[in-house]
Amino acid sequence: MQSELQRGFVLHRRPYSETSLLVDLFTEESGRLTVIAKGARAKRSSWKSVLQPFTPLLLRWTGKSTLKTLTKAEPAAITLPLQQIALYSGFYVNELLTRVIESETPNPALFQHYLKCLTGLATETNIEPTLRLFEFQLLQILGYGVDFLHCAGSGEPVDFSMTYRYREEKGFIASLVKDNLTFYGRDLLAFEALDFSDDAVRQAAKRFTRIALKPYLGDKPLKSRELFTQNILLLK
């Protein structure tokens, strides 16, 4: 039985039986796991307001199977105030973690990246650099090794002004072809430095992470992306 409280966040929650919840958690020391929160849907349950996304929590659970039983959950701090686009971006980040990281695999570094990402979403006016940085950090932790500094075909250093075409599992090859897989050398150098201060670089980074994350996500569309699109259309 786990004795120490762990820091963590709710990634997703869904009904389980008449009064309980199944909750996907991301914790600092145990990684991602799923717990049953018994009675959390009951009218008088204090967990109903506690088990919310973007609230830093202190958690305890028990159980040896892949499905644990939550025994304690209390706020460690106030809920991070994500609103409008930042809120949907937070749902997107949560869905990424739910879909691509293995269950019960400790990753304290990723937890810190996630915490900084949520803080950035809550405080920054322009959230795009925060999102791109987290996506690249996630790819690094997943073991996605791409050389942004050298041409995969020749081994020559990437030239700032040249264009390069991405080839899965190989890297970037100098190319005059211009399509969705083509990137400028200046973009690749910025990717390596994790520098997303330039708008054109951010657009290129967004395009690249969609390509790079696809093998991990498969063909199933992201629900958070669909929800964001639907709500943007409603606001127009």
From Swiss-Prot:
Keywords, ordered alphabetically: DNA damage, DNA recombination, DNA repair
Any one GO CC term of the record: bacterial nucleoid
GO BP annotations, alphabetical order: DNA recombination; double-strand break repair
Listed InterPro entries: ARFGAP/RecO (IPR037278), DNA_rep/recomb_RecO_N (IPR022572), NA-bd_OB-fold (IPR012340), RecO (IPR003717), RecO_C (IPR042242)
Intrachain S-S bonds: none
S-adenosyl-L-methionine in keyword set: no
Keyword field contains Glycoprotein: no
PANTHER family in alphabetical order: DNA REPAIR PROTEIN RECO (PTHR33991:SF1)
Assigned protein family: Belongs to the RecO family.
Protein function: Involved in DNA repair and RecF pathway recombination.
Protein name (Swiss-Prot/TrEMBL): DNA repair protein RecO
Native organism taxonomy: Bacteria, Pseudomonadati, Pseudomonadota, Gammaproteobacteria, Pasteurellales
Gene: recO
